[in-house]
Each structure stands twice: as C-alpha cells, then as structure tokens.
Amino acid sequence: VEETLMLKGYFAQSKSYILYRSERTRMRAQRKSICSLFAEGDALEKILDKVQTDFPEEMYELSRLDEKFRSFLKPEMGESAKRAALTRAAAELTTQEAPHWEFIAARILMHDFPADLSRALDELQLHSYFEKVSYLCERGLYGSYILESYTKEELDEAGTFINPAHDEKLTYSGLELLLRRYVI
C-alpha cells in the first residue's frame, strides 16, 4: 500500500499510513505481551483491545500494566491467581492523574463473571429472568411480594432491561463490592 501511495506522489498519506500501522503493531505487541502469560488469552485480548480504544491516552498504555503485573507474578501462580494479580496491578495504577485505571481494573475483574454466572444458572436450570427471581424468592433472598405483584411476562420483560454494556461504567471498587456483597 505504501509503495502505491509513494508512486502516485501521496507522500503525506503514505507517511500517515506507515505511522498508523506502526502504532497498531506496537499496541498489539503490548496486548500479546500480557495475554501470552495466560493459557486462554483470547478473551482477555479482546478486553485489552477495547481498553486501548477507550483509553488512548499515554498514561493508560498497557506497557505500564504489563510492567506492574509482571512485578506481582510468581512461577507457581495459576490462571485465577494471575488474573487477580492483573486486576490488582490495574487497580494499583489508579492515581489522581490516571483515574481511569480503576475502570480498567473493573473490566479485568468482570472477565470471568459472565462465564461463572452462566455455569451456575445452567447447574440450577434457570433459563429466564422469571425463573431466577422465583428461585431467589423460594430461598428467602428476595421478598415473595415480587412474585405476587408481577406476572411472569412482566418479570421476563424486566430482565430485558439489563444491559451488560453498562458494566463498563462500574469502577473496580464498586464492582468488587457489588460482586462480594450483593451478587447472589
């Protein structure tokens, strides 16, 4: 592509393209450096790619996260411990000058939750929002007034209001508190 641009006299465009490609290669290398330390790094790479898109500022470069993360690594660490260390590294990079590391830490923390939740729901054979609410009411974790006040259709409709994209608005401290104290 660069050669064609150069031959046609588009020197500025060629330079821009070369710089763009070089930057993309550098960013990919940063992601791969972190993901190479995990057995299943594909899902994590998608998260880190989105982090690079959403937080393009220099203070949020993944090389900083990689360096901090590697300082926590120990040879005997399993996948779960490594993910916890990566989350901790992102959380510890949070400063007044770089407050968005807390959102990045939350995204990493949230990495395993959907799969864990799906497994738990499959084990309990809960497939609709109504079934989830019914299960929690039966165990006394939700008030029975919910089932008395709403129909199955209304509860299933309420379940459609949940938008996983909003998970990215949670900070690490908020998500950690939510998962530890309130997720049933």
Q: What function would you assign to each model-found segment?
A:
Residues 2-184:
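Extended catalytic cores of very large enzyme megasubunits
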